[in-house]
Amino acid sequence: FLAEENIIPDSYKETNQRYMDAYLNGTLQMEDWGKFSLVFYDGKTAEDIKETMERFFKEVFEPMINIFALKKIHHHYENNDYLLLATATNEIIAKFAAARLGFDDYVATKIVKKDQTIYTNQIEFPPAFKEGKLTMVRQWIEDQKWVGKESFFYSDSVNDLPLLDYVSHPIAT
């Protein structure tokens, strides 16, 4: 999307595909991925990127939403379940995605900020990836006093095995 909008060079597509292949294979190095994938945000505020993010979600994200996923989300919503999005994706995209899908909260890879408002191309550790995602979800559970409650987690990634092993109802899609 960013390359098509001439926001980043076309050459990023090939590099992005290599990172996606590494993610799918379980070999992604998140620090390197962060430096690459966050280049668009570097030096910008949330207000600076708002319009681009809204277009991305309307033109790219929403058409990609799987009807199976929407049905599952709706099922949990109808059961008055609390919906927490846990994703390795950066916090900016996760915030938009959680809002668009009707989630109550989200856990995502955090971006280092300058002066608390200006994004960089660096991620905070731990990222919400592999064991780091489990660590962040456990922290969220503790902070929200959610301990001992039934939990479901849906994933299509080998990178989520730690969290799938942790929840009461793991669902590999």
PLM feature segments, named:
Residues 51-54, 58-173:
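C-terminal cap/substrate-recognition subdomain and adjoining C-terminal extension
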